[in-house]
Amino acid sequence: MPDRRSVYEYEDLLACGRGELFGPGNAQLPLPPMLMFDRIVEITETGGEFGKGVVRAELDVKPDLWFFACHFKNDPVMPGCLGLDAMWQMVGFFLGWSGGEGRGRALGLGDLKFSGQVLPTARKVVYNVDIKRVMRSKLVLGIADGWLSMDGEIIYRAKDLKVGLFKQGATPS
């Protein structure tokens, strides 16, 4: 049975990255530096915009985060793809948390809009994904809408984030 708490601290997320939270061969988060949040502050199978679940996570922004040194020299900004990846990570975590079996893979999204950027002067990033649909057949597929806020202002919006869980031997095509 998966670990079904509603809050996960950094050490819990690392355990997930090592494959210890949802069992061998099941959903894992990436390990640092690609783990893009410090904690999950809420996860439920109800609620959210569509009433089918929500995941909310936070990243404490520090000027020494690895990507600021290389993206870009003398013009540091968090790559937008990392914020997007964080939302995919959260959908995959939700699928494992809700009992889905298999390894997670991002499968795409419908639409993405950036209206700001995460700078090293920011204090906190909040990510939110609202689960729209979960399909469980040979493939476990989650679809969600998400947003990223920096210091309280929503600056990314993603529609139809898709993540699949694949059992050993099956691969996304």
UniProtKB/Swiss-Prot annotation:
Coiled coil: none annotated. GO terms for cellular component: cytoplasm. InterPro entries: FabA (IPR010083), FabA_FabZ (IPR013114), HotDog_dom_sf (IPR029069). Its EC number is 4.2.1.59, 5.3.3.14. The keyword Zinc does not apply. Pathway: Lipid metabolism; fatty acid biosynthesis. It catalyses: a (3R)-hydroxyacyl-[ACP] = a (2E)-enoyl-[ACP] + H2O; (3R)-hydroxydecanoyl-[ACP] = (2E)-decenoyl-[ACP] + H2O; (2E)-decenoyl-[ACP] = (3Z)-decenoyl-[ACP]. The active site is at H71. SUPFAM superfamilies: Thioesterase/thiol ester dehydrase-isomerase. It is found in: Cytoplasm. One of its GO terms (molecular function) is (3R)-hydroxyacyl-[acyl-carrier-protein] dehydratase activity. Gene3D superfamilies: Hotdog Thioesterase (3.10.129.10). Pfam families: FabA. GO terms for biological process: unsaturated fatty acid biosynthetic process. Its main location: cytoplasm. Keywords: Cytoplasm, Fatty acid biosynthesis, Fatty acid metabolism, Isomerase, Lipid biosynthesis, Lipid metabolism, Lyase. Necessary for the introduction of cis unsaturation into fatty acids. Catalyzes the dehydration of (3R)-3-hydroxydecanoyl-ACP to E-(2)-decenoyl-ACP and then its isomerization to Z-(3)-decenoyl-ACP. Can catalyze the dehydratase reaction for beta-hydroxyacyl-ACPs with saturated chain lengths up to 16:0, being most active on intermediate chain length. Homodimer. Belongs to the thioester dehydratase family. FabA subfamily. This is 3-hydroxydecanoyl-[acyl-carrier-protein] dehydratase.
